[in-house]
């Protein structure tokens, strides 16, 4: 079956938007991912498309691209993302290899 353009997952108080990142308006993949959820009041957006690791905030929303374990796209390392959620706190980081 076909996957939706976006999904929202709730982990306790943490509201996470998930999208591929190619759709939407904006000049960059992070901007397009952000604009996909602009009306959803999410805390974090996890996106892909570019295969380039990214971790930054846009208007208070944590934007995270885990990168790629199979295609570096000019980056020095392959990467994956690791998310840890405990009670009211969370951490998201890249693992490079």
Report the location of each language-model feature.
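Short small/polar-residue motifs
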Residues: 5, 51-53, 79-80
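Active-site neighborhood of phospho(di)ester-bond hydrolases with catalytic His/Asp-centered motifs
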Residues: 17-20, 43-49, 64-66
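A short helix->loop->beta-strand "cap" motif at the edges of active sites that frequently abuts
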Residues: 60-61
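Helix-adjacent hinge/juxtasegments
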Residues: 1-31, 35
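Active-site environment of divalent metal-dependent phosphoester hydrolases
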Residues: 1, 24-28, 45-57, 71-74
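Generic alpha-helical hydrophobic packing signal
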Residues: 15-17, 43-44, 55, 82
């Amino acid at each position: 079956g076909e996957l939706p353009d976006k999904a929202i997952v709730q982990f306790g108080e943490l509201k996470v938007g998930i999208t591929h990142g190619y759709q939407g308006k904006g000049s960059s993949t992070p901007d397009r991912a952000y604009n996909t959820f602009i009306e959803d009041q999410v805390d974090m957006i996890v996106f892909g498309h570019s295969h380039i690791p990214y971790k930054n905030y846009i208007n208070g929303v944590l934007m995270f691209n885990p990168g790629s374990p199979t295609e570096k796209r000019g980056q020095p390392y392959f990467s994956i993302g690791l998310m840890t959620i405990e009670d009211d706190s969370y951490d998201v980081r890249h693992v490079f290899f």
